[in-house]
Amino acid sequence: MKPSWRQCRKVTGAGGLGAPLAGSSPARGAGQARRAYVAPGPRGALGGPGCRALSSGGGGGGGGGEYKTHFAASLADPERFWGKAAEQISWYKPWTKTLENRHPSTSWFVEGMLNICYNAIDRHIENGKGDKIAIIYDSPVTNTKATITYKEVLEQESVPLAPGRDLDWDEEMAKAQSHDCVPVLSEHPLYILYTSGTTGLPKGVVRPTGGYAVMLNWTMSSVYGLKPGEVWWAASDLGWVVGHSYICYGPLLHGNTTVLYEGKPVGTPDAGAYFRVLAEHGVAALFTAPTAIRAIRQQDPGAALGKQYSLTRFKTLFVAGERCDAETLEWSKKVFRVPVLDHWWQTETGSPITASCIGLGNSKTPPPGQAGKSVPGYNVMVLDDNMQKLKARCLGNIVVKLPLPPGAFSGLWKNQEAFKHLYFEKFPGYYDTMDAGYMDEEGYLYVMSRVDDVINVAGHRISAGAIEESVLSHGTVGDCAVVGKEDPLKGHVPLALCVLREGINTTEEQVLKEIIKHVRQSIGPVAAFQGAVFVKQLPKTRSGKIPRSALSALVNGKPYKVTPTIEDPSIFRHIEEVLKKAS
């Protein structure tokens, strides 16, 4: 029996958020939605001395002419640019206004009506692609594999919400009646998704339907370079933003086959799992987190388990979620034998802020350490704490000049005051990403850490991410987190929590000496790096992020909060014990 898509996907449009659940029928809404053509409307203390100058993400060379044209057009006339992209989505009612600034939020495709389920499923069937494979379900956990066509998805996802608790699945499916797709306004909330909470309490991000559908459909080709029908795999948890955007909605909107993998990079059963899935299902592009690649490398440094698989259809590997250090990047290129492209985005944006837009001709061999160039629609800048633009390679606050493009969040659930305060008050006229980094002369962005993770060492602001990359480039360390430890003389000094790779026979004392020397050579004595402890594992969210704020509090003997998103909370106790022994 094939697994049901209903069992796998997140139910949206339910409860207080919106309309009744859209069900299915082969003829439901057929011919009602249409691609709307709308005539274009009117045009709509980081940093330091010596760093002030214009810094913006669209310039520089190496970007490809098509990318430059698209980026410039998206900023000069966003209404025309995104109105054109919206023609690729089917609308029940065309919008009356492409963009409306509501300070600080932005509304896109005002009064337009659509249904995202219709766009992701029904319209492909109406276009004669009902027998194409929509979902490949691969679960080493249950030893189940299945392919599900668009027609089968439609047939299986038409169960209305009903009160009750314990119900028999097959009985309910047998009784189910089909339901027409329900048109909703473009600004209608599609879902509430809570952030991973690595920088504080999780925040309920509210996602508008119309702009999200337009942006995701556009990114599948323009950012990720895929054609409809190709196999795409986002190796994420379905409950995180990558799962929502690029396991569920994005690939289905664009007509791609999406791989739904219920397993891990290691342990299900081994470090060859990713290679097996890529080969077996003919995956063209993979999106995963650097932490997954590090886990594979830690257990199988030579990728011996992956060598038995032929990856002839595999074209590109995309990574995001945590900064990808140069060592992990180069190892990935070597073992997967494809371009490996880091890019950067947030739960709040729902899609990439910066990337190598290979569908628009961006280079597939960008410099190591970067996270791409500004995606069209995102006017990324680097500012100091006084809102002065910084020169190339000066560390500062990464912000986005308003308006935000389609698909970005419209608010925080039941907390609009926090929405305004957290994201828009510090830098009026900009969206504050709360990340720190710099741009190079070519317009590539280097995201170094969260702003709170910049360590003040005797007046010098040092990026925790830069130290982490230096530590990880030493051949003995498989994973690392750097936090600031309070120091009576220097204010703070960096402390590294390190996980050694498998098979390292050198003593921890010797490794520590080598790491200190290595960091001193690569960053300089200004980092004042003198300390590291070795732990068996780092705490991470299920999306692969390290809760650095909690680790910082732990290291400094302060109360810390373990959020429900942490995969293994017991790791905190282990680190506490290691720190006690070290002191």
Model-derived segments and spans:
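N-lobe entry segment of adenylate-forming
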Residues: 2-165, 579-583
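Adenylate-forming
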Residues: 74, 121-125, 153, 157, ...
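Conserved pre-ATP/AMP-binding loop-to-beta segment of ANL
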Residues: 131-133, 160-194, 201, 211, ...
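Conserved S/T- and glycine-rich ATP-binding loop of Class I adenylate-forming
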Residues: 153, 189, 195-198, 220, ...
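Conserved adenylate-forming
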Residues: 155-167, 228-229, 254-257, 262-394, ...
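Conserved AMP-binding loop of ANL adenylate-forming enzymes
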Residues: 211, 216, 223-262
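AMP-binding/adenylate-forming catalytic core of the ANL superfamily
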Residues: 279, 286, 400, 404-405, ...
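Flexible lysine-rich "adenylation lid" loop at the C-terminal edge of ANL adenylation domains
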Residues: 386-387, 489, 495, 535-557
